[in-house]
């Protein structure tokens, strides 16, 4: 199957475990996803600037596998926005913590009998934003899984995600988190 065929046929997988809890003046979204891939393969997908643009909503100016300053370049169609991506923890292949602008992403990778469990803790502005964020990460991690399966789809991020089921995921995660969905086109 070609990348264009895989992309055309993409549909979001089932909802994943998600919760949002107060974290000081912000909210912490926790998103859990199981993969059949090794921790090392997942670590590479999370840290390698050659792999990030194939699935993530950003790329990086360097490998994120070491602590120190980094710049993340958020991608939405033709728009590029540079954000702080400073890595504060990098314990290969199990823990990665870095900034994404004002947010903090903490990725925890655990080996399981079936492969790997990835837990993402992402700080967001408010509880309603958590549902939007969960929908976005859901799609990105579906794409990462396909990439690791050697069946690349290509990134589905930003406004383009609307064409691939993002709105429905946003509504479903909003219901799961007990909040009203936000329409990002009205923000």
Whereabouts are the PLM-identified features?
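Charge-dense, helix-prone N-terminal extensions
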Residues: 2-5, 82, 113
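Beta-strand/loop substructures that line and gate deep hydrophobic ligand-binding cavities in soluble
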Residues: 13-18, 22-23, 88, 95-148
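Hydrophobic ligand-binding cavity/cleft-lining segments
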Residues: 1-59, 185-187
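A conserved amphipathic terminal alpha-helix motif
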Residues: 1-11, 124-186
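Hydrophobic residues positioned within well-ordered beta-strands of beta-sheet architectures
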Residues: 29-31, 83-85, 118
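Glycine-rich portal/gate segments that line the openings of hydrophobic small-molecule binding cavities
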Residues: 34, 51-99, 180-187
């Amino acid at each position: 199957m070609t990348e264009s065929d895989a992309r055309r046929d993409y549909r979001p997988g089932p909802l994943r475990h998600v919760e949002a809890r107060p974290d000081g003046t912000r909210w912490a979204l926790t998103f859990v996803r199981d993969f059949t891939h090794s921790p090392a393969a997942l670590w590479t997908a999370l840290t390698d600037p050659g792999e990030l643009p194939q699935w993530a909503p950003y790329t990086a100016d360097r490998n994120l596998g070491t602590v120190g300053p980094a710049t993340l370049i958020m991608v939405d169609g033709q728009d590029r926005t540079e954000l702080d991506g400073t890595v504060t923890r990098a314990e290969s292949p199990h823990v990665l913590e870095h900034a994404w602008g004002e947010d903090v992403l903490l990725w925890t990778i655990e080996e399981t009998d079936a492969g790997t469990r990835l837990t993402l803790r992402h700080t967001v502005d408010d509880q309603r934003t958590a549902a939007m964020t969960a929908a976005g990460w859901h799609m990105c991690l579906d794409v990462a899984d396909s990439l690791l399966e050697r069946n690349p789809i290509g990134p589905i991020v930003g406004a383009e995600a609307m064409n691939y089921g993002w709105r429905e995921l946003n509504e479903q995660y909003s219901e799961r988190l007990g909040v009203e969905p936000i329409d990002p086109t009205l923000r």
